Amino acid sequence: MKKIDIKILDSRIGDCFKLPKYATPGSAGIDLRACIDNTISLEPGETNLISTGLAVHIADTGLAGIIIPRSGLGHHGIVLGNLVGLIDSDYQGSIMVSLWNRGKEIFTIQPNERIAQIVFVQIVQVYFNIVDNFQKSKRGERGFGHSGRV
């Protein structure tokens, strides 16, 4: 199994803030927590960049990190400001999470609250070749629902 070294920037993690971990043996993502001193109120329509206290350098060009929302926050209208985050293998820095309140109510983020998840995925890079045409397929150029609904 591939291991990735995650650096902890904030010395309070493991003491005041819980150390990130997989919740179950079958968990694909690791919860990221708000590493903040005080509550943050997100007004409807507002975004805020929240520190996780973590930094990462994946350093393997075959891997990337994907930051995705937690379904429990989506229930309250809280989503990621950029909807999904991508951490390239050569990025070396802090993991920050942009939260956006799409709801109609003020939402309060508590210190140590789980605010997003990170999933590590394998990456395949593609090569582009200029061609005159493709080999014909049954589907052809039909898109936007042409493969059927059922």
UniProtKB/Swiss-Prot annotation:
Q: State if Magnesium is listed as a keyword.
A: yes
Annotated catalysed reactions = dUTP + H2O = dUMP + diphosphate + H(+)
- Which SUPFAM superfamilies does this entry report, sorted A to Z? dUTPase-like
At which positions is substrate bound? 70-72, 82, 86-88, 96
Biological process (GO) annotations held by this record are: dUMP biosynthetic process; dUTP catabolic process
Required cofactor names:
Mg(2+)
EC number assigned by the record: 3.6.1.23
GO molecular function annotation: dUTP diphosphatase activity; magnesium ion binding
Print the keywords alphabetically.
Hydrolase, Magnesium, Metal-binding, Nucleotide metabolism
Which pathway does it serve? Answer: Pyrimidine metabolism; dUMP biosynthesis; dUMP from dCTP (dUTP route): step 2/2
Query: Which spans are transmembrane here?
Result: none
Q: Which HAMAP family match?
A: dUTPase_bact
Function comment: This enzyme is involved in nucleotide metabolism: it produces dUMP, the immediate precursor of thymidine nucleotides and it decreases the intracellular concentration of dUTP so that uracil cannot be incorporated into DNA.
Q: Which family does it belong to?
A: Belongs to the dUTPase family.
Q: Which NCBIfam families does the entry link to?
A: dut, PRK00601.1
What this protein is called in its record is Deoxyuridine 5'-triphosphate nucleotidohydrolase
Please tell me the species this chain comes from: Baumannia cicadellinicola subsp. Homalodisca coagulata
